[in-house]
Amino acid sequence: MFIKIIKSWIIELISPFVFLRFKNIFELKKYLKANEKYTGICASVYNRYMFIRGSYIGITCEFKNQPYFPHGILGIFISDDTIIGNNAVIFQQVTIGSDRLSDTDNLGSPIIKDNSYIGAGAKIIGNVTIGNNCRIGANAIVYKDVPDNSVAVASPMRIIIKENKMDNRFFVKRYNGDIKFYENGYFHKK
């Protein structure tokens, strides 16, 4: 018990220095994955950060660039080995999970391609591919592939294929009237 308390204090003491070195949690994750460091002080700081927020973003999952979380990473679950493309927007309480049961037809982790928009509470489970420019509706449960330029809604899942490419950038109107959108890891002025 005493050792656990000491370890917890050490992690709390070292956390600010780790974040000074890596700037944000995603840079720390990138470092841990690149160097295959799944244990140690930096991994403990990363895991504690996720635990405090009720989230899990697997160290071995891959982001093409940093996704945008409009409500922060509270309650987000992204399993190991998931691949998420450029310009993803992921709302709160989303689960992007692998299917690891031996008797499943869907064994593996999801692949989410570029310009995806994943609504609050959505669940994407197993070895599925979400195509480019797709939207996943709030509370949708996705268990099969979604083609490019589609919307997946409800449970049981329905897929609506769109004729034209959808603009899934996340827009924000600021108090001064400026409109900005999130793309390639940054907000840009419209």
Predicted regions and their residues:
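Conserved beta-strand-loop-alpha-helix hinge in the C-terminal portion
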Residues: S150-A152, P156-F170
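Left-handed beta-helix
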Residues: R53, I59, K64-N65, P70-H71, ...
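Terminal amphipathic alpha-helical/low-complexity segments used for targeting or macromolecular assembly
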Residues: M1-G54, N164-K190
